[in-house]
């Protein structure tokens, strides 16, 4: 796809020289056709729909031309943040969360404040499977039918979209091109799953052991409901542990402040409800702990996907408890392999099936080219050349870890 100059400038600023597989596949059809995009969490679905839509924006026309619907405020704030970065290179581009503005692109929740504009030609539903749940399906159908009056092109994106949900979309929008880059809906190649055997001890003892084991990492702790979250945060506070919690009962300003702090790497332990399991980018977090299992099975995949983003490895922990066995059996049948971890009496963790060597990081073609360039510079053998070469390559990997990989949005 050929991008207009402002988008080329943005891509250059963010050092994006290649696109992920879902982006390349979607670029071939969107926004000329209605599309469904399915790919792993952290694979770059946001840019897959956002860049082509922005490529069609006419900034001389001060009217809404594209809209992105999202299921949570956190995801809305995240996309608006990305768009504000793009605006620095895209002179004249206006974005908003309100339909009563003259912004070119609107990012919004589904609700009563939707205003139909005949100039809107591109409509996206991110994390569309959430809109297809029983509690919100009727509202989603009404929204789709409202915009169909002016025949825009639709985009539907998610990490988990099953056949039944796909058929629901087909009933409303046709023709439809499906781009499926995720052949195994229940598995993520960069997530390691662990089942913690408590050996008769309390779950909170297991949680403390995990927090101690990962004391140098940022940790997300998921709770399935408000009661569970309240009980856990009370235990953490009683034990004088430092943490933040994010859930639907907070005010929008409170939620935004905590979310921003977590995204900016100033929160080590974040206790959250499942509202944060969808589409959110928290690049500094590498560990997920499910204090309890989600009510909707597929939400477990979205939970674990919070820490396997930007080609980074992530660890996801579940407690081996009697009331979890039914769901764990279903997860196993879906192909999720859990490594066994044991909580010792002294509070340490034993990983009998886990090799302690670090996983090799995924290497992009851009990084491979840079490594080849370093090696090519040492054609003549000089004293300590291997040591200097190794140090330069190590610095490359360190820089990659520090810099956010924008292409995976």
Curated annotation (Swiss-Prot):
Swiss-Prot/TrEMBL keywords = ATP-binding, Helicase, Hydrolase, Nucleotide-binding, RNA-binding
- Which Gene3D superfamilies does the annotation name? P-loop containing nucleotide triphosphate hydrolases
- Hydrolase recorded as keyword: yes
Q: Which SUPFAM superfamilies match?
A: P-loop containing nucleoside triphosphate hydrolases
Residue positions binding ATP: 39-46
Reaction catalyzed: ATP + H2O = ADP + phosphate + H(+)
Every copy of the Helicase C-terminal domain together lies at: 190-349
Kindly indicate where the leader peptide sits in this chain. Answer: none
Tell me where on the tree of life, at the top rank, the source sits.
Answer: Bacteria
Q: Where is this motif: DEVD box?
A: 126-129
Record GO terms (molecular function): ATP binding; ATP hydrolysis activity; RNA binding; RNA helicase activity
Which EC class is the enzyme in? hydrolase
Family, according to the entry, reads as follows:
Belongs to the DEAD box helicase family.
Give the protein name, as stated in the record: Probable ATP-dependent RNA helicase MG308 homolog
Whose protein is this, by species?
Mycoplasma pneumoniae (strain ATCC 29342 / M129 / Subtype 1)
